[in-house]
Amino acid sequence: MKKNGLLLVNLGSPDTPTTPDVKRYLKEFLSDRNVIEMPPALWQPLLRGIILPTRSWRSATFYRNCWTKDGSPLIVYTERLVAKVQGLMPEWVVKMAMTYGKPKISDTITGMKKECQNITVLPLFPFFTKSTTQTVIDKVKDADPEAKIIDRFSAEEDYLDLLAKQIQTAWDRGKYDKLLISYHGIPTAMVNHGDPYRDETEAATAELIKRLDIPEKQIKMAYQSKFGPMPWLKPYLRNTLLNEAQLGHRDVLVVAPSFVADCLETLEEDQVQNYQVFRENGGNNLVMVPSLNDSPEFAQFITDLVQRKG
């Protein structure tokens, strides 16, 4: 008898932190019309002629800085999370796929359909946005139109409780001037076209403030990981860090709820590049709240969510 299947999907990673593999990965990622809305006739010459040749080697350096002996941290943590969820759901078939790179969504679903009667897909993006979740939906529906998709979970009480506990534990371990809640940014144009991402991140921030034993005046919200010249959601994290340092707030705690697993953005952009900006402008300590990664609590949350909605 066939089982039910659960597919956990994250963004993806190059196969190796080498320039050719990073170039292939970036080409796939930056060719997605949900990510880059510019007409392909204008965008592709720019991508192939300027961006990939100049950005690939630089990004490869950043990937090498955070690569582990087991591989890409994003892939490793997602694999471990799958194993833990599988242990909690032995009656299900639990797999993982990546939006870009490997394992591909289409290949994984094709394999799952051989042993699964129904497939539920959970993109590991708490907040819905066209540039991440919609691409997963498109690829899943191409592979299995009948698959059920849980397209967001940032408003789930258990998720907010879990995230707040993670933040509070980190806050209580140190002495900080500010808590910065930093979400992955998206172009402002996407929000103007109806993307719900900003509303969802602002709602999550409000819910976290209610749950945290931290004075609201010590909490700020920001957006990070801006790409390209177009305006993205503000305030930018890097500018916020610079301002906090100049105000004499020398010790900050940063949490990045958009990233459920440690990846290039948390390990390199935040802990290295943003930390350097903060220190160079008078800051002292920048500490990251650990991502949920493969924690037993996060695995249990996913299990409960899927059994309730899957």
Swiss-Prot record:
UniProt GO molecular function: ferrochelatase activity; metal ion binding
Superkingdom to which the source organism belongs: Bacteria
UniProt cross-references to InterPro entries, sorted A to Z: Ferrochelatase, Ferrochelatase_AS, Ferrochelatase_C, Ferrochelatase_N
Residue ranges crossing the lipid bilayer per the database entry: none
Catalytic activity: Fe-coproporphyrin III + 2 H(+) = coproporphyrin III + Fe(2+)
CDD domains given in the database record: Ferrochelatase_C (cd00419), Ferrochelatase_N (cd03411)
GO cellular component: cytoplasm
Main location: cytoplasm
Positions with a binding annotation for Fe(2+): 184, 265
The enzyme's E.C. designation: 4.99.1.9
Entry keyword set: Cytoplasm, Heme biosynthesis, Iron, Lyase, Metal-binding, Porphyrin biosynthesis
One GO process term, biological-process aspect: heme biosynthetic process
Matching Gene3D superfamilies: 3.40.50.1400
Intracellular or extracellular location(s): Cytoplasm
PROSITE patterns linked: FERROCHELATASE (PS00534)
Involved pathway(s): Porphyrin-containing compound metabolism; protoheme biosynthesis
NCBIfam families from the UniProt entry: hemH
Summary of the function given for this chain in its UniProt record: Involved in coproporphyrin-dependent heme b biosynthesis. Catalyzes the insertion of ferrous iron into coproporphyrin III to form Fe-coproporphyrin III.
Similarity remark: Belongs to the ferrochelatase family.
Protein's name according to its UniProt entry: Coproporphyrin III ferrochelatase
Upper taxonomic lineage: Bacteria, Bacillati, Bacillota, Bacilli, Lactobacillales
